[in-house]
């Protein structure tokens, strides 16, 4: 009897697993694995510890996020994305980029993507940008503004930039 129950259970789980695999596309699965690798476990653990009301507030807050922002500040145009513009072509409209293109792709900081728009990115610590003379600080070149100043690295810090004035703001570095 135990063997029969065990076999039935395994068979049922296999059907559910097969169904789940058919319904989950490869890109979503890759994104979930990458998210888990980059701290998703801690996020889920902390989220589950919240009371239902606070969970709802967090979800409502997250629903307001966008994958990109197009801004005009004074006379200047800006495109803000977390990562980059994966699969960039000049003809491609911003709406055509996937979540992966905008969140996980890294831009080529030696390339000017737009002559009339500044591309503001995070995700790539400025310490890892080739030919960067000032690692750990905001990088500006070729109409790029890279604001990830590698807070996770020795000597790294959090950074922000005021697009109206160009003024840069930094936390103290993580060494002190």
Region locations from a protein language model:
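Short, charged, surface-exposed secondary-structure boundary motifs
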Residues: 11-12, 155-159
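A short acidic, often aromatic-flanked loop/helix-cap motif at beta-alpha or helix-coil junctions
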Residues: 8, 152-153, 176
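Core catalytic region of metal-dependent phosphoesterases/phosphodiesterases
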Residues: 1-27, 31
């Amino acid at each position: 009897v135990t063997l029969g129950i065990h076999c039935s259970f395994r068979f049922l789980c296999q059907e559910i697993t097969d169904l789940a695999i058919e319904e989950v596309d490869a890109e979503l699965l890759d994104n979930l694995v990458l998210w888990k690798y980059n701290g998703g476990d801690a996020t889920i653990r902390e989220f589950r510890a919240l009371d239902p009301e606070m969970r709802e507030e967090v979800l409502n807050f997250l629903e307001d996020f966008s994958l990109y922002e197009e801004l005009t500040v004074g006379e200047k145009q800006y495109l803000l994305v977390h990562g980059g513009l994966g699969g960039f072509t000049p003809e491609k409209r911003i709406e055509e980029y996937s979540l992966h293109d905008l969140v996980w792709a890294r831009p080529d900081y030696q390339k000017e993507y737009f002559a009339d728009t500044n591309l503001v990115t995070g995700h790539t610590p400025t310490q890892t940008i080739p030919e960067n003379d000032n690692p750990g600080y905001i990088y500006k070149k070729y109409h790029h503004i890279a604001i990830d100043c590698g807070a996770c690295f020795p000597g790294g810090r959090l950074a922000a930039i005021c697009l109206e004035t160009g003024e840069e703001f930094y936390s103290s570095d993580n060494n002190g």
